[in-house]
Amino acid sequence: TAIFQPALPFVLENGNNLIFRPAFSYVFDQPIASASGFSDVSQFGDISYDLLYSWSSSGWTFGAGVVGAIPTGSGISSDNWLLGPSFLAVKPTDWGIWGFFPFHNEKVGGSGDDTSITSLQYFLFFSLNDGWQIGTGPTITYDWNADSENDWTVPFGVQVSKTTAIGNQIVKLNAGIEKNVVAPDDFASDWKFTLQFSPVIGNPFQPNPPSPPVDAATRAAVLAPIR
């Protein structure tokens, strides 16, 4: 899966941040059902997004907001509009960063099957030299509408990331591999390979943000390897 996920932070008058992050994905070799059985296709997936109000306290960065998805109509689209609550807690440390990101997606429109999925992403990354990090950031999901053989997806994996600046543009590059140790019986990929490009884009709707600017902890939260 290749993912482009820009982050657009709005700096508020109180010094906190409103962060919008759409995610555009291209999925390779996704198994889908067809008249002749299952086949693998490579197409654009639905557009997921999160909108978080972010603040810092006692060395933590927190966020609360919503997540959702917009259907693209592709062969692997859910054909649903999704929306639900989310929460973020990030702890930067001397050795790296760790935290968790629980969220829930519920069908609010569309022609696809009913959707009610709760997810928890936990992440733990160790900082190396020159902006490099290594760690893990899998997302565990529970499908409330599935039967007992298909409700849980539990992956484990490893990711390597690099945070750098291209001119004045801060970007995070991330590559990861995951193995589903628990997966739906119907059909699910055993392995997942991900390449992600995440720039922090200067917000065109806020060319002159109020002081203070985005602080280091919030910037770490924006660039954290969350979904």
State where each predicted segment sits.
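Transmembrane beta-barrel domains of Gram-negative outer membranes and organellar outer membranes
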Residues: 1-109, 113-227
